[in-house]
A protein has these predicted regions:
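Phosphate/diphosphate-binding loops
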Residues: 3, 51, 92-105
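Short N-terminal helix-initiation segments at or just after the protein's N-terminus
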Residues: 35-49, 99-104, 137-145
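Conserved glycine-rich FAD pyrophosphate-binding loop
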Residues: 75-77, 85-98, 110-253
């Protein structure tokens, strides 16, 4: 039995080691979880940026300010142009990047955090900022990010989703690198990611019916993962290794 009634226990964190082993150290037969009350309220900021470098740096600024948003997600222009006709979330399709920052908790906590995040984003160079004024508008802002994957199917026969994770301060550098790879491999890439923890989900768009495109998509994905490792990151943050990333393990180790 690992863990306990406290979220963190003193000494070695064997619970994290066991979970992180992904089944190599044993099989979980029973899980005990703690239920917490649903936050009383939540609001989200939608910030637009004129370039991905500024947007990436804004993410680092939010975290550096000691703010821990309930949600911190980012989409590049390819992604916002992909989803806006599909869900009409109100995204600025001329913006190079869209950042969604959510605060939840009591009314007073949310208002304070929204004010702090707004100040940080304005200082980081956001070209436009909108704050949800109702639950319906909050869900509308989020609808674009949540529908990024099905929206990709509207503009491309196939897509290849990656799962690299990088230090947040390297977001701008990696996004710039991925843009260069689009030219190298001759394929488009829509970037959507969990900006708060640096977990990238680039969607490489291709057509498997065209000879060579699948192989180019695989090579593109391998290059993205190699870049993630080069900047101090890892080849997977959520999806695991499996068969898909087995060759990239040699890059990681």
């Amino acid at each position: 039995e690992l863990g306990g009634e406290c979220l963190d226990s003193p000494g070695l964190d064997l619970l994290a080691v066991f979970i992180g082993s992904e089944g190599m150290l044993g099989i979980v037969t029973e899980v005990t979880v703690k239920l917490i009350p649903k936050p009383a309220t939540a609001r989200v900021i939608m910030a637009s940026f004129d370039d991905v470098v500024t947007g990436g740096n804004a993410v680092a600024n939010v975290i550096a300010a000691g703010i821990i948003p309930a949600g911190l997600e980012m989409m590049d222009q390819t992604s916002s142009r992909m989803v806006e006709p599909f869900v009409k979330a109100g995204y600025d399709i001329d913006a190079a990047a869209i950042l969604l920052c959510e605060a939840d908790g009591t009314h007073e906590e949310v208002e304070e955090e929204i004010a702090r995040m707004t100040a940080v984003l304005e200082g980081a160079g956001a070209s436009a900022i909108a704050v949800s004024q109702s639950e319906a508008e909050r869900m509308k802002f989020w609808s674009g990010r949540k529908n990024a994957f099905p929206a990709a199917g509207r503009i491309s026969p196939d897509y290849y989703c990656m799962d690299g994770t990088i230090p947040r301060k390297k977001l701008a550098e990696v996004l710039t690198g991925i843009a260069g790879m689009e030219t190298t491999h001759g394929l488009r890439c829509a970037n959507v990611f969990h900006a708060g923890d640096g977990n990238l989900h680039p969607l490489i768009l291709f057509d498997a019916n065209k000879p060579g495109e699948f192989e180019r998509a695989e090579a593109f994905g391998a290059d993205i993962l190699a870049l993630c490792v080069a900047v101090g990151g890892t080849i997977t943050g959520e999806h695991g290794v499996g068969m898909e990333k087995i060759n990239s393990m040699c890059v990681q180790f």
